[in-house]
Regions:
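Membrane-anchoring alpha-helices and their flanking helix-loop junctions
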Residues: 1-140, 155-193, 197-226
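Histidine-centered phosphotransfer motif of kinases
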Residues: 140, 145-152
Length: 226
């Protein structure tokens, strides 16, 4: 049953994005969707958290997460599309840097996103998406430095897109709108969902590993020192 829901979620999310990409540009509508789409994540996160806390069971968490993920991806994807259009329509707010700076950062951060996905696939036996949620808790490699290496890399990638477009408005949108919305999702919803699915192992991992900003992993206390 969840496979069918995932299929419908992919079709719905992709359909919304394609529809927005094919709409004639309208600055006012784009601004509303760029801000409203990102902040629309907040009530969805609140509702998802309430559903998790009402019955903190693994199977329920999987179902709730499926719907929350597709809602979040649809809203954030729509907001990114519209924020890009707003940024490109404001040439007077250009960043005084060559676009190659943004392109180089896009390549590096994009590669890190792929590495984080591979890390999660190999160590967590899954993906960070509802279509194949991880079955094990990934705690090493990139995930030993930060609990969310993929999210961090993706946010840097978005800033890099703004630098590549030389759009001050887009970079400001990422910093002031997108990042806060993503952080609320991670802190309010995802941490609780992972705690339900992985229990004490996740709580211990959360205590020693930062949520976003990387930190060198602590060496095991019983490690032999020569």
């Amino acid at each position: 049953m969840r496979t069918l829901v995932n299929l419908l979620g992919i079709v719905f999310t992709g359909g919304v994005w394609l529809w927005l990409l094919n709409q004639p540009p309208d600055q006012t509508v784009s601004i509303i969707l760029a801000i409203g789409g990102a902040f629309g994540v907040l009530p969805l996160v609140w509702l998802g958290r309430r559903l998790l806390d009402a019955q903190p069971a693994i199977e329920r968490a999987l179902w709730v997460t499926t719907f929350v993920h597709y809602g979040v991806f649809t809203l954030l994807g729509a907001a990114i599309i519209e924020a890009t259009q707003v940024g490109m329509a404001a040439p007077g707010w250009m960043i005084p840097l060559p676009p190659e700076v943004g392109l180089a950062l896009m390549i590096v951060s994009g590669a890190l996103v792929l590495l984080a996905m591979a890390n999660l696939a190999l160590r967590g036996l899954g993906a960070p998406f509802a279509i194949a949620l991880s079955r094990e808790l990934a705690m090493d490699w990139l995930y030993a430095w930060t609990r969310n290496p993929m999210v961090l890399s993706a946010l840097v990638f978005l800033i890099a897109v703004g630098l590549w477009l030389r759009s001050t408005l887009f970079v400001l949108w990422v910093i002031a709108v997108a990042i806060p919305a993503v952080l609320v999702f991670l802190k309010v919803y995802e941490e609780r969902e992972l705690e339900i699915r992985f229990g004490e192992a996740y709580r211990e991992y959360r205590e020693k590993t930062p949520m976003l900003w990387p930190r060198r992993p602590e060496k095991p206390r019983n490690e032999f020192r020569g």
